[in-house]
UniProtKB/Swiss-Prot annotation:
Lineage: Eukaryota, Viridiplantae, Streptophyta, Embryophyta, Tracheophyta
Induction info: By auxin.
Name of the protein this chain belongs to: Auxin-induced protein X15
Pfam families: Auxin_inducible
Keywords annotated in UniProt: Auxin signaling pathway
Family annotation (InterPro entries): SAUR_fam
Organism whose genome encodes this protein: Glycine max (Soybean)
Superkingdom of the organism of origin: Eukaryota
Family membership: Belongs to the ARG7 family.
Gene Ontology biological process: auxin-activated signaling pathway
Length: 82
């Protein structure tokens, strides 16, 4: 049994994200998620961005936006944004 997060698109091996989406890397394994750009305006997601800024500044090791939280926390937060 699984659950579906319609706002999160399945990450592919492609470097580019579709128009209106942004690739982020999450968790210890740096799993790639492709999320709607509209999430950037949500207060709960902005909290994650603040954490990312505090931990990484503007130097993100994966070349894209790295979110310093577990995959479970990220999915729980983004699930509420859908």
């Amino acid at each position: 049994m699984g659950f579906r997060l319609p706002g999160i698109r399945k990450a592919s091996n492609a470097v580019d994200a579709p128009k209106g989406y942004l690739a982020v890397y999450v968790g210890e394994k740096m799993k790639r998620f492709v999320i709607p750009v509209s999430y950037m305006n949500q207060p709960s997601f902005q909290d994650l961005l603040t954490q990312a800024e505090e931990e990484f500044g503007y130097d993100h090791p994966m070349g894209g936006l790295t979110i310093p939280c577990s995959e479970e926390v990220f999915q729980r937060i983004t699930c509420c944004l859908n």
